[in-house]
């Protein structure tokens, strides 16, 4: 009888810990001032020769969490992003929909969540990426994600401007 009670307790404890782990993944700050965070990222990006990468989504969004897991756990992607971008996660939820701020970016939420934006060192939107094009099966296509980060980096944009005779 005691063994059954012990086993039942362990099973219930495991289930509870699993549920708690799922609830603690919070990559989006629902209280953040998106406009201030992006302005700070633009300033830092300008000083460091980078672009700004904005992830719009929420802690409620499984595809947002999957994307974050990919780019933070894949060492090559993590290094690529840190070397070329200032990253800002802009929350969209019932607690804080950031509607006014997202309007200044051209309503990127029209693509669903997550949606990604690349801003230049002056805060201008260079690219809005619908995440659907990066998805594969139940996750993301790593090569497509890497390609997006490579093609929209400040370095690549400067190289393109030099090669094709224009300026960014």
Residue ranges and their predicted role:
Residues 5-15:
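Sec-dependent N-terminal signal peptides
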Residues 15-21:
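Sec/Tat signal peptide C-region and signal peptidase I cleavage site
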Residues 21-28:
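Cleaved targeting-peptide boundary
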Residues 30-51:
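A short beta-strand-turn-helix
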Residues 32, 74-99:
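Thiol-based oxidoreductase modules, predominantly thioredoxin-like and allied folds used
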Residues 56-72:
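Conserved redox-active cysteine motifs that mediate thiol-disulfide chemistry
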Residues 93-113, 122:
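Structural alpha/beta surface segment adjacent to cysteine/selenocysteine redox centers
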Residues 110-164:
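Non-catalytic, surface beta->alpha helical segment in thiol-disulfide oxidoreductase systems
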């Amino acid at each position: 009888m005691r063994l059954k009670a012990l086993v039942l307790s362990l099973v219930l404890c495991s289930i509870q810990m699993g549920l708690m782990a799922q609830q603690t993944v919070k990559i989006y700050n629902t209280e953040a001032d998106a406009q201030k965070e992006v302005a700070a990222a633009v300033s830092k990006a300008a000083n460091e020769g980078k672009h700004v990468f904005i992830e719009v989504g929420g802690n409620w969004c499984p595809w947002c969490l999957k994307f974050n897991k990919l780019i933070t756990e894949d060492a090559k992607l993590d290094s690529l992003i840190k070397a070329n971008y200032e990253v800002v996660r802009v929350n969209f939820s019932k607690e804080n929909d950031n509607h006014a701020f997202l309007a200044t970016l051209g309503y990127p939420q029209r693509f669903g969540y997550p949606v990604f934006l690349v801003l230049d060192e002056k805060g201008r939107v260079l690219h809005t990426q619908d995440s659907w094009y990066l998805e594969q099966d139940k996750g993301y296509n790593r090569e497509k994600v890497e390609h997006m980060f490579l093609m929209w980096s400040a370095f690549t944009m400067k190289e393109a401007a030099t090669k094709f005779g224009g300026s960014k």
